[in-house]
Swiss-Prot record:
GO terms for biological process: microautophagy; positive regulation of TOR signaling; protein localization to vacuole; TORC1 signaling. Coiled coil: none annotated. It comes from Saccharomyces cerevisiae (strain ATCC 204508 / S288c) (Baker's yeast). Pfam families: YNR034W-A-like. This is Protein EGO2.
Length: 75
């Protein structure tokens, strides 16, 4: 993904309400097991949330039945 090369995005995962992966990139491809935990995160009224991981931040956005997780550096 070209945007990843020009930003601090380390990877992404897009998944549906059943935990099926729609697309993954970068470290997201190696963190598919995160889907179970990420799908339980409480989102705000607009469908956003942020989760601090070990060395990564995970930015979540859900619209309809699709959730997008964007992994960035936790710096």
């Amino acid at each position: 993904m070209e945007a990843e090369k020009q930003s601090d995005i380390k990877g992404t995962i897009a998944f549906d309400t059943h935990g099926n992966v729609i697309e993954s990139t970068g470290v997201g491809s190696q963190r598919i097991e995160d889907i179970g935990d990420l799908s339980k995160v409480t989102l705000d009224a607009e469908g956003f949330a942020q989760v601090q991981g070990d060395s990564l931040l995970v930015h979540l956005y859900k619209r309809n039945d699709i959730t997008l997780a964007v992994y960035t550096s936790a710096q």
